[in-house]
């Protein structure tokens, strides 16, 4: 697992570039030390891969077009494919550290158009209303997933059969998330989360909204 302190983008885009991501095994594990990022936050971005995460310590806030979610230590969740998001470190008392599995769903689904993809993968990744599936302690079903998720980061890439064991664990977690997301999947979403132009426009709005707000307040104070 690689410690990361920054984010890279494809040229001219806010799509995240994932160093070390290979087609023959489309997966990377990361340990994000958010306090070492510039400004203690990860700016607006997206990626085709899904982002399965667990909070090792501290707490972070996830922002998406749909709103904000706070994740303290011991919580976790999954960010859906192509969802615009940003994160920022919140805790000032302990290190803000996030563990991440970032993978293309083909790792679980196999060949494009497979039965597994159609039945269990596509219903989640094509649902625009599902931006994040949060997992918090205190809910029995979510705690079961969190326990398995935390354990999954203890798998060693040096052990025999690592790739198969990892895929098996991620598949088990995905099935549990699939069941948990049933109420979310039954709701209808309207926006197209895969439209890059819309993402860029939304990033501009989010990044400049605060500037406009401060400017208006400044004007009021001097009029």
Model regions and ranges:
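Generic protein-terminus/edge-of-domain signal
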Residues: 1-76, 82-83, 118, 129
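Short histidine-centered beta-strand/loop micro-motifs
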Residues: 40-46, 63, 88-90, 111-113, ...
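Amphipathic, well-ordered alpha-helical segments in soluble domains
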Residues: 51-54, 117, 141-148, 169, ...
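Detector for the N-terminal beta1/A-loop initiation region of ABC nucleotide-binding domains
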Residues: 61, 86, 208
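Ligand-binding loop in jelly-roll beta-barrel domains
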Residues: 82-106, 113-116
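Aromatic/histidine-rich interaction motifs
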Residues: 115-146
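Short, Lys/Arg-enriched, Trp-marked, Pro/Gly-tolerant hinge/linker segments that flank
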Residues: 131-142, 155-217, 221-222
């Amino acid at each position: 697992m690689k410690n990361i302190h920054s984010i890279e983008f494809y040229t001219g885009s806010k799509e995240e570039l994932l160093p070390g991501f290979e087609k023959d095994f489309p997966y990377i594990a990361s340990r994000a030390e958010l306090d070492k990022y510039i400004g203690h936050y990860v700016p607006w971005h997206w990626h085709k891969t899904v982002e399965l995460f667990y909070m090792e310590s501290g707490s972070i806030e996830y922002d998406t077009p749909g709103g904000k979610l706070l994740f303290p230590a011991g919580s976790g969740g999954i960010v859906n494919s192509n969802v615009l998001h940003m994160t920022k470190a919140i805790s000032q008392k302990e290190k803000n550290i996030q563990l991440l599995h970032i993978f293309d769903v083909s790792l679980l689904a196999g060949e494009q158009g497979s039965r597994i993809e159609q039945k269990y993968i596509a219903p989640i990744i094509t649902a625009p209303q599902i931006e994040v599936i949060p997992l918090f302690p205190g809910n029995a079903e979510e705690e079961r997933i969190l326990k398995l998720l935390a354990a999954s980061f203890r798998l060693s890439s040096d052990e025999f059969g690592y790739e198969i064991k990892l895929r098996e664990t991620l598949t088990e977690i995905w099935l549990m998330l699939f069941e948990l997301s049933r109420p979310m999947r039954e709701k209808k979403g309207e926006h197209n989360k895969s439209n890059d132009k819309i993402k860029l426009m939304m990033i501009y709005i989010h990044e400049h909204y605060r500037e406009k707000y401060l400017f208006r307040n400044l004007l009021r104070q001097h009029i």
